[in-house]
Each structure stands twice: as structure tokens, then as C-alpha cells.
């Protein structure tokens, strides 16, 4: 970055997809709150889109965690006779509408970009204006597991097919980008059943398109410990949030000790008077 140049945003936050592992994003939010740091823009895919939007709407980390603690999968999806997907996710959309404080992107406290996949045209699509609940549902709609979501006549599915870790969406807009990748590892052991095979297949698909984005972050938060949790694990919300918090804290401390990047961090946080030591 040339001296004296400024980008549109100082600090951006990019949140990957990863199913229930996305609860780790809440732990990152908690650390940001404790440090008095607020991103200027957020981008998220799938679980990252859901968690990021709740945070962008002004919900505190602990409040977001309470929304999901003690929930059952049936509260978000309903098994159906398979047509376009095994589960109907209308319940998920109603959950979002019930808990989110706003109805549109324009009402959010922090600009938010939701990444989904345009199934009809075979490309990634970025939502950042208009109604917000359906784009979130689209971004989280894993193909075959959930029905595609139709928005303005176009079928959308999980954004992870093309862009599971959407750092590059905001890279050129921000001085500093913090990236949280909750999908970096999968165990070599797995069950030979349709669920495990599908989960593993999607994991490899999502992992394959994250390599470049991992190197695009100024600060990358990820750990193999995320791999201990399954895609639809709603029983360990507290544990996953804690892993996210501990990983973020450890990463932040390493980051500020790197002399070549410390100046970037300070530059991004100057207006907030919040520098981690």
C-alpha cells in the first residue's frame, strides 16, 4: 500500500462457511468487542453470512450465542419428500426474520455482503442491498440437503460452492482484512454412510476454493481444532464459540508481534483507540 493512500474501509472482516463450526465466529466477535474493535465492513458465506449479519445488525456476541444454544436441527429445517432437496429450510428463514433486528441490508449498523451461488448461471453472487433474510437462507442452502432459494426468478444455493472464504470480495476495499476460516481441516477417519460421505465431499469442495483467500488476509484466524465438530453439531455451541475465542486471542497476539504487519494493525485501529498488547 502506497503511503498516504486510503481505501474505502480501514478494517474488513471475512467469515467462511462451515456449518455449525461457524459458531466459532461468535467467539471472534466476543474478542473484538472486548478490544473495542468494530469492523467497517463484513462479508460472509453460509454460516459466516448468518453470523456476520447478526453481528452487523448490532447483536452482541453473547446474544447471538443464546439464539442458538439448546436448539434442535428440526427448528431450522423440515424433512420432505425429496424434490430439489432433502429438507425444506423455510423454518430457517422464519428464524432469521424473528431474531434479526432489521429487514434490509440498508438498516444494518455495519455494511454486510452475503455470498451465494447463482445455480442458473454458474457463478458467485454478492447480495448487499434490499431484503436480507432470503439471501442469508440462500447462502446457507447446501445443495441436495436443502432446496435452492429463488430470488427474483433465479435459483441460489450455498455460496461455498465458488467462494467459501470470501476474503477477495473485500480485499481491494480495505486497508486491513481479518479472515476467519472455520473449515480448514477434516479428519482422515469417517463413517461409510450417506451423511458422512456427503459432508466430507462438500468439505473438500469448500476447502479447494479457499487456498488463495487464506493468503489474502492480513490476519488469518483458523485452527485444526474446528475439525472436531460436525457440520450440523448444535449440541456443542458453547465449546465451538470458546474455540473461536481462544484461537482469535492467540492469533491476535502473534499478529501484533510481527513487525511487518503491526503498522497495518495500528493504522486500521487508530480511530478506535484500541490496540491489542
Question: What is the role of each PLM region?
Answer:
Residues 1-45, 53-277:
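Patatin-like phospholipase
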Amino acid at each position: 500500500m502506497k503511503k498516504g493512500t486510503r481505501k474505502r474501509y480501514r478494517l474488513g472482516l471475512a467469515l467462511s462457511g462451515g456449518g455449525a463450526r461457524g459458531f466459532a465466529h461468535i467467539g471472534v466477535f466476543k474478542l473484538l468487542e472486548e478490544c473495542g474493535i468494530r469492523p467497517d465492513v463484513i462479508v460472509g458465506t453460509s454460516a459466516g453470512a448468518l453470523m456476520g449479519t447478526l453481528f452487523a445488525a448490532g447483536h452482541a456476541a453473547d446474544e447471538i450465542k443464546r439464539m442458538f444454544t439448546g436448539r434442535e436441527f428440526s427448528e431450522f429445517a423440515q424433512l420432505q419428500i425429496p424434490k430439489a432437496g432433502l429438507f425444506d429450510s423455510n423454518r430457517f428463514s422464519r428464524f432469521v426474520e424473528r431474531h434479526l433486528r432489521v429487514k434490509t441490508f440498508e438498516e444494518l449498523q455495519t455494511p454486510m455482503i452475503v455470498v451465494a451461488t447463482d445455480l442458473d448461471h454458474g457463478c458467485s453472487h454478492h447480495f448487499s442491498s434490499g431484503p436480507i433474510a432470503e439471501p442469508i437462507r440462500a447462502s446457507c442452502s447446501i445443495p441436495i440437503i436443502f432446496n435452492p432459494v429463488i430470488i427474483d426468478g433465479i435459483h441460489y444455493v450455498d455460496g461455498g460452492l465458488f467462494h467459501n472464504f470470501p476474503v477477495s470480495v473485500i480485499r481491494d476495499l480495505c486497508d486491513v482484512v481479518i479472515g476467519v476460516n472455520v473449515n480448514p481441516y477434516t479428519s482422515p477417519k469417517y463413517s461409510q454412510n450417506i451423511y458422512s460421505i456427503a459432508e466430507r465431499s462438500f468439505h473438500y469442495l469448500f476447502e479447494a476454493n479457499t487456498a488463495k483467500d487464506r493468503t489474502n488476509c492480513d490476519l488469518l484466524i483458523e485452527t485444526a481444532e474446528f475439525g472436531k465438530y460436525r457440520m450440523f453439531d448444535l449440541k456443542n455451541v458453547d465449546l465451538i464459540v470458546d474455540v473461536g475465542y481462544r484461537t482469535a486471542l492467540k492469533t491476535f497476539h502473534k499478529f501484533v508481534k510481527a513487525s511487518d504487519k503491526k503498522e497495518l494493525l495500528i493504522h486500521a485501529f487508530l480511530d478506535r483507540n484500541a490496540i491489542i498488547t
